[in-house]
């Protein structure tokens, strides 16, 4: 074996021994040919520490690992002790959050505020009153001086004459799509949740649709909404003139008195619809069209009460409502025209597929009462004129053909109520059998 091969073998053997004594690789620098002062002050202290720890044997390391494995909670306990120590040193944390919202309203400085929740009286927070604002609204929420709300108001049976609003309606007026952000942004408003009895009462009175029966409905008082928004919730409202806290707004000078309040309509097209077509006092849905069929009105009988917005008023918020309202109107028009043609004009209904004129069977003659020859000044006119007289007690009542059914079929089979109904129908058909 040559000297070079022997030297290489000795280096490999030395490396194996080094790895067997320690899991760490040997990063020692060969300083044999380097001129380094042993008393150098800039010598790396980390290198000395690593070199001193190089002699740790595997048994000590394995014992330490075994001890950690036996107590898997050492690290967690150590972290908990550090947290307790930090708390003892004065590190404070807020572990509970206040469940009460902190209303913000004019008239109270930050120095006077505290974390105590405000009192709720008559379903609204007790906020400071403005003498000038009290001349614009009553305690029940009725506006004074000819002012009108942009949204409808109604009362609850057990709340007397106090006026309320659906929270979603003023929310849309001021630019919110729902009431969640409405209450989060305006904590001065108290959220009053209806119970099932109150919802049923409003549904029976026509204020709420039946689909709201199983939903959570939030109300706000009309007085509270006026205090919060002032002229923005008033039809044609003007700054300071129609605001509740007029004195403070006049002092701040942020708005010009008498100028029209900012128009929030562009933020919500549904608000535009509410302003142009406000809900009726009894809460009837304007999409439902009550048609009286036997009035001789023109074809465009709904032009005066058109509730369908034009294309420029459609948006991502109200398109579904506008589509539903248009379908409701179209169905009403079809039904009105069909009944008018059949029963009023007596012209029949032409089928678009077969081009056949259909006439109700109840309007056709069943017998000839007589014929006569009329005197005609024109001898060449040999036409025949049919004069048909229709006599029917009720055109809307169908003819079922019960008058032709013998009594033996249903006697002793049906009860008295059904028998009475059959007899009435038979008598009706017999009276109108011959024209």
UniProtKB/Swiss-Prot annotation:
InterPro entries for the chain: CRC_Rsc7/Swp82
Any one GO biological process: nucleosome disassembly
Family: Belongs to the RSC7/SWP82 family. RSC7 subfamily.
Subunit composition and interactions: Interacts with ARP7, ARP9, RSC3, RSC8, RSC30 and STH1. Component of the two forms of the RSC complex composed of at least either RSC1 or RSC2, and ARP7, ARP9, LDB7, NPL6, RSC3, RSC30, RSC4, RSC58, RSC6, RSC8, RSC9, SFH1, STH1, HTL1 and probably RTT102. The complexes interact with histone and histone variant components of centromeric chromatin. Component of a fungal-specific module (HTL1-LDB7-NPL6-RSC3-RSC30) within the RSC complex.
Pfam families per UniProt: CRC_subunit
Subcellular location: Nucleus
GO CC, any one term: nucleus
GO molecular function annotations of the record: chromatin DNA binding
Composition skew (Acidic residues), residue ranges: 30-66
Keyword Cell inner membrane applies: no
Residues the record lists as Phosphoserine modifications: 86
Descriptive protein name: Chromatin structure-remodeling complex subunit RSC7
Keyword annotations from UniProtKB, A to Z: Chromatin regulator, Nucleus, Phosphoprotein, Transcription, Transcription regulation
Chain's role: Component of the chromatin structure remodeling complex (RSC), which is involved in transcription regulation and nucleosome positioning. RSC is responsible for the transfer of a histone octamer from a nucleosome core particle to naked DNA. The reaction requires ATP and involves an activated RSC-nucleosome intermediate. Remodeling reaction also involves DNA translocation, DNA twist and conformational change.
Region (Functional region): 248-435
Taxonomic lineage from the root: Eukaryota, Fungi, Dikarya, Ascomycota, Saccharomycotina
């Amino acid at each position: 074996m040559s000297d070079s091969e022997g030297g290489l073998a000795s280096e490999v053997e030395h490396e194996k021994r080094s790895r067997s004594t320690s899991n760490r690789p040997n990063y020692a620098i060969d300083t044999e040919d380097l001129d380094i002062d042993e008393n150098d002050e800039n010598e790396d202290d980390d290198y000395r520490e690593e070199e001193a720890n190089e002699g740790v044997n595997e048994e000590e390391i394995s014992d330490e690992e075994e001890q950690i494995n036996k107590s898997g909670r050492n690290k967690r306990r150590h972290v908990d002790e550090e947290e307790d120590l930090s708390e003892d040193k004065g590190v404070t944390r807020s572990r509970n959050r206040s469940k009460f919202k902190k209303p913000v309203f004019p008239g109270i400085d930050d120095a006077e505020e505290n974390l105590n929740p405000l009192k709720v009286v008559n379903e609204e927070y007790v906020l400071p009153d403005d003498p000038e604002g009290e001349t614009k609204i009553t305690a029940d929420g009725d506006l004074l001086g000819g002012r009108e709300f942009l949204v409808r108001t109604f009362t609850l049976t057990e709340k007397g004459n106090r006026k309320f609003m659906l929270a979603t309606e003023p929310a849309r007026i001021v630019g919110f799509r729902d009431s969640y952000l409405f209450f989060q942004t305006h904590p001065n408003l108290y959220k009053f949740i209806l119970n099932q009895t109150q919802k049923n009462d409003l549904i029976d009175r026509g204020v709420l649709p039946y689909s709201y029966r199983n939903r959570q409905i939030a109300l706000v008082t009309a007085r509270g909404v006026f205090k919060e928004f002032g002229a923005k919730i008033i039809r044609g409202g003007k700054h300071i003139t129609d605001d509740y806290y007029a004195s403070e707004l006049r002092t701040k000078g942020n708005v010009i008195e008498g100028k029209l309040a900012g128009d929030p309509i562009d933020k919500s097209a549904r608000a535009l619809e509410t302003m142009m077509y406000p809900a009726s006092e009894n809460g009837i849905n304007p999409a439902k069209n009550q048609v009286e069929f036997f009035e001789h009105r023109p074809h465009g009988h709904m032009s005066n009460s058109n509730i369908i917005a034009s294309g420029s008023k459609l948006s991502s918020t109200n398109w579904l409502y506008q589509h539903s309202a248009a379908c409701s109107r179209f169905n009403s028009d079809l039904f009105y025209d069909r009944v008018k043609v059949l029963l009023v004009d007596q012209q029949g209904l032409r089928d678009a597929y077969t081009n056949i004129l259909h006439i109700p069977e109840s309007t056709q003659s069943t017998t000839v009462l007589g014929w006569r020859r009329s005197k005609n000044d024109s001898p060449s006119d040999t036409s025949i004129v049919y004069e048909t007289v229709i006599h029917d007690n009720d055109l809307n009542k169908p003819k079922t053909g019960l008058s032709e059914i013998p009594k033996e079929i249903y006697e002793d089979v049906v009860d008295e109520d059904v028998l009475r109904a059959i007899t009435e129908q038979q008598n009706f058909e017999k009276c109108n059998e011959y024209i």
